Amino acid sequence: NSKLNDDTAAVYFENPNFLGLIEDAVDEIAQKCHSKGALVIVGVNPITLGVLRPPSSYGADVVVGDGQPLGLYPNFGGPLMGIFATREDPNFLRQMPGRLIGATRSKDGSRRGYTMVLQTREQHIRREHATSNICTNEALFALAVSIYLASMGPQGMKEIGQQILSNSNYALKRFKEEKFESPFFSGSFFGEVSVKTKRSSKDISKRLVDFNILGGLPLGRFYEDLQQVSLFSFNELHSSSDIESLMTALNKIEGAK
């Protein structure tokens, strides 16, 4: 609130946020931003949208995200596909970076086709002022994501979200049973569970490699007062045996001299 004033152009927040928590005040945040004339930009993990509210429902003006969870390999950080969406408002659409493709029909109406739309934004018309200058070609990844989404459908996306919630909540249950301080942060979460250990999170992460486990994220890298807190991520592919292997490894590491 103290940093939000009439000079604020936009406010960006993520849901779930960096600590893996689901923001529960999204409506209030959006309302306060709009009351000051600021745009609301929301970063999302698209795999969550099968079970969480879409940003449009709480007033997001712009939504961004990474398409990697939608059927793409991590590829050590890239290349991947970005997601960029706005409200259906001409003022936003005309300022979007990249090319816009719209669906249409053939002249006789028998076939569906796709073409560039709002071409007054394009380089062959606006030259150096074209907003489509700001783009890269990620068509191959966009195609893979389209196939993934078409294969999954709304029900499939919902089921994946539910499976991730189930896996992460099972992991939380096991952390508690093994007497770890978890969750370290209070609040609802999606697929990431915060855990405090006796050893530093950096040491935990390093030693887990010996057990063929990558994780969790040492939050001490970002926050000085969280040197013993890790963020463990769980997805739809993790099994109960995977989670048990993690518990076994953590107990051995914590008990080692």
Q: Which residues are covered by each model-predicted region?
A:
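Conserved PLP-enzyme active-site core in the AAT-like
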Residues: N1-G113, K179-F180, K202-L208, G220, ...
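Structured alpha-helical segments in the cores of large, soluble enzyme domains
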Residues: N1-K3, N17-L19, I29, C33, ...
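Hydrophobic alpha-helical scaffolding
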Residues: P16-I22, I41-V42, R53, Q68-L72, ...
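A short linear-motif detector with a strong N-terminal bias
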Residues: I41-G43, D61-G65, R112-G113, T120-R121, ...
